[in-house]
Amino acid sequence: MNTVVLRETHGKVGLIRINRPEAMNALNDAVADGIAAAVDAFEADESIGCIVLTGNEKAFAAGADISVMRQSSFDYMHAYKTDFVTRNWERIRTARKPVIAAVAGYALGGGCEFAMMCDMIYAAENAKFGQPEIKIGTLPGAGG
């Protein structure tokens, strides 16, 4: 069971919650795979009318998991060829049901781009969007 992505049903709404609070919901392969699986499940469920993607009150998603990128074995070229972080994002864009990003707290880098992949963004008053990749010497993974 994928515990970094939680799936709930509330009436006709399918809720997908990124659940990595210790890492400010930083995105990694497990998160990307879990979100894609949840979207697939809600798409197959005829009782679901829309899908809401969210994080927690501190962070929607604070971008790519930089701790993975800092590992000496991390290969940037391989990461871009294999769609590190952005893998499965196309699944959100192609969903037949509307996907709404409910953003509270930080949506930075890949988290900001992830929210932009949704059909609509509902931003809380404390939502903060940004593309800080330049500060670590890289470009936005999905183009910004």
What is each of the regions a protein language model found here?
Residues V31-I35, F84, F114:
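Hydrophobic alpha-helical membrane-association signature
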